[in-house]
């Protein structure tokens, strides 16, 4: 039997050098680590890793080749009260594995035990890691590097975006390949999108609870192998990486960036009753935040929390991010529950992972977007991230909905959100683009559902409608559900137009949820994380071409307005913005706080957004000059020159002079 050589302690993971494979694994508390390789017949061969450099275990297997399946058994104490849960009866996934063979099914053998260890061997059913070799021709691929001020983000799910698209070949619908198909790229280009933000593509597992209900984790926020692509989105799992890179290369050629939603805050091992896949059995005490009683700090709502202040876990997270940039040429990341990244355990701007990213010549050059909260005390950190980060701006989301759908927001508060929430983000040298403005996202109502439902309808999720937020700031316009009279449909359409205009013509970086531009509905489900079905798949055959054209016209209009693309904070008298009342006069202090919901916003001295958010038709006197309504509010071939706008109830219009 071949013996392992000592090998090298870096890089982490399994790496083929043409002659054999070097294996490395971090564990600060292990007493012994076995590499387990599986031959073509599934026969297991075990080798002790002979090298031990600091906390890195390593060994080199001569003559090993790509395609080799492997895992680890890690020996050490079973001391739950101290956070140690070693169990060599369980085969473990390499945290840095690039490919996984097998499924993460709900099986009692994939649990380590709660108070007492479960010593039943699980190698026969446990997923295995696969050694891969990386040869890919990027040709002349170059990142688009779209300036932040020109960035328009489109948040989409790999499968849901194309699974029902009639113009994409059936065999590639819902896959990585479909993202790079000319039909999809042409659509994004015509819409005006500059960055495609994908829900998680790193390999994830469905929670046992969902599997028992016949459901699955659709969104992907339950990671199990952070360096491996989720194989279900590939035409062939063996070629998933190349399919993904082909799509990125095609998108880059069209000038479209790719941003990955990445989950560094928790793992699919969940709470102490959850499955054992990897980190818990490799070094539970190091990888997770552990309470004094040995249980997990659950700052994520998912059962565990990764300890991103531990040096080895920081190295792991940094290596993971670099992998996606260097190997897949992604252009940035959106970090799920990103407050966890700054926990020490209190949140700090100089937390170790933030510092590592800032000091990294690779990661400091890509787009970084934080979901700036977690569920622990002190977890709401909007506006408090380091200057390299942009942040999801929930202030904008709530303000836009309250202004147009609940009618309870003063003009001053609305204007503050329209001006990139400078009260929140104008600090530490940050620019307006730090505010990622959104009206909707994957999490919550779609835009159409915001105007059709007053209440969530999440019964299909199997939790008796208890899951999902109740703070939706939505308005069904008088009837719960889709459909209704022509008048009802028109009022809902006007509200959608108002919300889209507010999103796409505000200062900051706009993010559009895929499907909002053509009227996609989830029938009132505001937490569709477990709905891998027609509820979440975009139905292109039912798409509203009129709404799509309206959205595209707004995006193209945005790109013409210097005050929005120059990415500079607006200052009094600089010509970027003037705030006027219905008589084209500057608003008084009282009007800002208590005045009627009527406002004119003059941008770059040439573009005028006239707003009447009252219940009555109102005459709005435009400023001096020759104004004409512009698309999408008037046909280019028939401009209306006017001095007074008859503002319909809950209406708005954009003019140019």
UniProtKB/Swiss-Prot annotation:
Residues 458-479 are annotated as: Disordered. One of its GO terms (molecular function) is hydrolase activity, hydrolyzing O-glycosyl compounds. The record marks 443 as: Transition state stabilizer. Its EC number is 3.2.1.196. It is an enzyme of class 3 (hydrolase). It catalyses: Hydrolysis of (1->6)-alpha-D-glucosidic linkages to branches with degrees of polymerization of three or four glucose residues in limit dextrin. SMART domains: Aamy. GO terms for biological process: glycogen catabolic process. Pathway: Glycan degradation; glycogen degradation. Pfam families: Alpha-amylase, CBM_48, GlgX_C. SUPFAM superfamilies: (Trans)glycosidases, E set domains. CDD domains: AmyAc_Glg_debranch, E_set_GDE_Isoamylase_N. Keywords: Carbohydrate metabolism, Glycogen metabolism, Glycosidase, Hydrolase. Residues 458-467 have a biased composition (Basic and acidic residues). InterPro entries: GlgX_C, GlgX_Isoamylase_N_E_set, Glyco_hydro_13_cat_dom, Glyco_hydro_13_N, Glyco_hydro_b, Glycogen_debranch_bac, Glycogen_debranch_GlgX, Glycoside_hydrolase_SF. The active site is at residues 336, 371. HAMAP family: GlgX. Belongs to the glycosyl hydrolase 13 family. Removes maltotriose and maltotetraose chains that are attached by 1,6-alpha-linkage to the limit dextrin main chain, generating a debranched limit dextrin. This is Glycogen debranching enzyme. It comes from Shigella boydii serotype 18 (strain CDC 3083-94 / BS512). The lineage of its organism: Bacteria, Pseudomonadati, Pseudomonadota, Gammaproteobacteria, Enterobacterales.
């Amino acid at each position: 039997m071949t013996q392992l050589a000592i090998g090298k302690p870096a890089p982490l993971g399994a790496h083929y050098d043409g002659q054999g494979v070097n294996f490395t694994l971090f564990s600060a508390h292990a007493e012994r680590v076995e590499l387990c390789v599986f031959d073509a017949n599934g026969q297991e061969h075990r080798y002790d890793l002979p090298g031990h450099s600091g906390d890195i275990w390593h060994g080199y297997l001569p003559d090993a080749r790509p395609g080799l399946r492997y895992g680890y058994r890690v020996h050490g104490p079973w001391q739950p009260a101290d956070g140690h849960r070693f169990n060599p009866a369980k085969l473990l996934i390499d945290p840095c594995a690039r490919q996984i063979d097998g499924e993460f099914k709900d099986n009692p053998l994939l649990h380590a035990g709660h108070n007492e260890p479960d010593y039943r061997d699980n190698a026969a059913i446990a997923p295995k890691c696969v050694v891969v070799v990386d040869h890919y021709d990027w040709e002349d691929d170059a990142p688009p590097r779209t300036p932040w001020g020109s960035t328009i983000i489109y948040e989409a799910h790999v499968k849901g975006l194309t699974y029902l698209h009639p113009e994409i070949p059936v065999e590639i619908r819902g896959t990585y390949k479909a993202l790079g198909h000319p039909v999809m790229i042409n659509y994004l280009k015509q819409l005006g999108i500059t960055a495609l933000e994908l829900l998680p593509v790193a390999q994830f597992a469905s929670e046992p609870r969902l599997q028992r209900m016949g459901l699955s984790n659709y969104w992907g926020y339950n990671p199990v192998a952070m360096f491996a692509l989720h194989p279900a989105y590939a035409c062939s799992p063996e070629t998933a990486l190349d399919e993904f890179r082909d799509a990125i290369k095609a998108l880059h050629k069209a000038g479209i960036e790719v941003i990955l939603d990445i989950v560094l805050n928790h793992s699919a091992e969940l709470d102490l009753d959850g499955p054992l896949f990897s980190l818990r059995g490799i070094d539970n005490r190091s990888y997770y935040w552990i309470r004094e009683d040995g249980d997990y700090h659950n700052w994520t709502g998912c059962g565990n929390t990764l300890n991103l202040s531990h040096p080895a876990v920081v190295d792991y997270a940094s290596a993971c991010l670099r992998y996606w940039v260097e190997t897949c040429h992604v252009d940035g990341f959106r970090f799920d529950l990103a407050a966890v990244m700054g926990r020490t355990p209190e949140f700090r701007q100089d937390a170790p992972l933030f510092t590592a990213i800032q000091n990294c010549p690779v990661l400091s050059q890509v787009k970084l977007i934080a979901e700036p909260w977690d569920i622990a005390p002190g977890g709401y950190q909007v506006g408090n991230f380091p200057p390299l980060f942009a942040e999801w701006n929930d202030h904008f989301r709530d303000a836009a909905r309250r202004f147009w759908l609940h009618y309870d927001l003063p003009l001053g508060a609305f204007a503050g959100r329209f001006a990139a929430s400078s009260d929140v983000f104008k600090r530490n040298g940050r620019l307006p683009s730090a505010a990622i403005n959104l009206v909707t996202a994957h999490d919550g109502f779609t835009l159409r559902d915001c105007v059709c439902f007053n209440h969530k309808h999440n019964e299909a999720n199997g939790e008796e409608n208890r899951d999902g937020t109740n703070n939706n700031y939505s308005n069904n316009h008088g009837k719960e559900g889709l459909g209704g009279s022509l008048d009802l449909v028109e009022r809902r359409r006007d509200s959608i137009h108002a919300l889209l205009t507010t999103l796409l013509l505000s200062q900051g970086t706009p993010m559009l949820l895929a499907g909002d531009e053509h009227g996609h509905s989830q029938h009132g489900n505001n937490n569709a994380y477990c709905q891998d079905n027609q509820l979440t798949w975009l139905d292109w055959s039912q798409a509203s071409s009129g709404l799509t054209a309206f959205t595209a016209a707004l995006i193209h209009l945005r790109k013409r307005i210097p005050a929005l693309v120059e990415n500079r904070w607006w200052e009094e008298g600089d010509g970027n913005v003037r705030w006027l009342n219905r008589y084209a006069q500057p608003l008084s202090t009282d009007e800002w706080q208590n005045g009627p919901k009527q406002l004119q916003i003059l941008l770059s001295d040439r573009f005028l957004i006239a707003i009447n958010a009252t219940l009555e038709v109102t005459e709005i006197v435009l400023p001096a000059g020759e104004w004409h309504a512009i698309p999408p509010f008037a046909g280019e071939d028939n401009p209306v020159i006017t001095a007074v706008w008859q503002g319909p109830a809950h209406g708005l219009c954009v003019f140019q002079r």
